[in-house]
Amino acid sequence: MLRLEKLLLSAAWLVIFGVATTVIHDFDTFWQLQSGRYMIETQSIIRTDLFTLAADAPRFEHCWLHDIILYFSYTIGGYHALSVLKGLLLGGTALALLAAARVRGASWPAMLLLLAPFWLSRGGWTARPQLWTFLLFAVFLLLLERHRRRGGREVYLLFPLMILWINLHAGAVLAVPILAAYLVGEGGALALRTSNLSAHAYKTLWLATGLVLLGFLFTPYTREFIETLFSAHKLGAGQEGAPITQMFNMDWRPTSFANDPYFYYAMVVTGVLMALGWRRLSLADLCLMGGLALMGLKLSRHTSFFFFGMVAILPVYVDATADFLMARLKNRFRRIPRGLATLGAAAIFVYFALPAYETYGLFRTGLRTWHFPIEAAEFVRDHRLPRNLYNTYDWGGYLAWTLYPEYQVFWDGRQDSPEMFNYGWRVMSGHPGWESVLDKFGVKTIVSKACTVDSGQHYPLLDKLRENPRWALVFADESSLVFVRRDAVGEAWLARHRLPDERIDDTILSEALLLVQTESRRYKAWWEIARVRMARRQYPEALYALENYLMRTPTRDPLAENYYRILLPLVGEPHSSP
């Protein structure tokens, strides 16, 4: 039985590693690649927004070491190497969490069962520097749990790890609340005489904490990190005092039941397990899980750490509950429940793994090409389209990676200038004055996505450009559109390359279809499909898209409901595909 338990847990870890080692599809990867290349080629640290039209704006490149590692990996194996790096970081995170659970005395079946919540963090499984924070968070937990049980000097390893972390990602500030949870928890337990930690080991923990805080000095951006630490309470899109530059970062929003119900379910499960396993309850565990829950409620991006805490901390509570129940069974029946529990844990793990597996598969490395303006960038470069460039927010990184220094992008995912961000948002949203912003920055070429990546809605800017006689569409593919100012190119060139406006809807439709194939919850993409299909009198496909839109939209849409009532008698049953 023990061999089977270990085999199943090893297989579960391998599945996590395989699903994590998949295609690169995150937009931020490319400004990080470009930053890494620039720093290696110039042997300098980035301090201003070099790659955008706000080139003089200060830039806090907190992940500078990650950028260099990312670019170095790319030079070795291209985008395939980046996929492998992503898998190694996430696989390493899971392994460190399991090791922490084992140090705490967890059984193999309990570890397998509580590995399932690891899948709930998959919203953060992108090739970003936050993966280093995932890994180092898990390693910190492992070392702290080892110190709680063994004492010694091993806890001083947190100091070099902190120096590494502080240069890889700004998430290093999380080291402070992690250590605070253990210091408060173990300090309280010592006062109550319920701690296994000696007074000397507790003093060592304080010394290690002091060294970790000293680690904030070992970075080119010490001042910026300290400011980040003391302004953490202002983080979060929509929060009072939060920077406008967080507006489009969905994971910077406060967590709600509507956008992440599993987080709330996980908190309930955690409370129940800790109550049932009260014999193993410790003040440090309460401080840690309570703190992680508060962090998760504050920001959606922090929910992952609560799920990680479940993997490392909760297995012993499952064991405590199981031991209580098993003690009431006769000896000859005890092996059967353990075997059933192991198989049940495996089934639960598979249940949580399936959505990610169906989306990403196993070990599919490389680049999700349709997600990026690959051919559009080549078109801009090959035809030397006139500067300056405007781009939609999430494509700034890729365009900087491929077009700098010939072109500076308008903005990218690391835009730290609130003024520039405001300008970019006004244009992208088609707000009044959008054209004056383009004139202010001398924009002659626009490279735009068709649909937003979060909901799938088409960009309002496209409607403005379609109606404006000063702009012409000159390139379109499955997700990219390129427009130029008519008066900025020659008439002969424009006559050869101008495309009809109908191609805009072609691109909106094709990208919306791709978006729902990878994530069907993008409800606005279903609406875009329905809208274009209805305009083209493709009514069966339109009805199918309308049905999916109405099923997923968070608010009632009377217009869509009316269209559905009109089309249903004409078509009958909805078409089986959009």
Predicted features along the sequence, with ranges:
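Membrane-interface transmembrane helices that cradle and orient dolichyl/undecaprenyl
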Residues: 140-155, 271-277
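C-terminal luminal/periplasmic domains and tails of membrane-associated envelope-modifying transferases
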Residues: 357-394, 404-408, 415-578
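Transmembrane-helix motifs of polytopic, lipid-linked glycan transferases
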Residues: 84-104
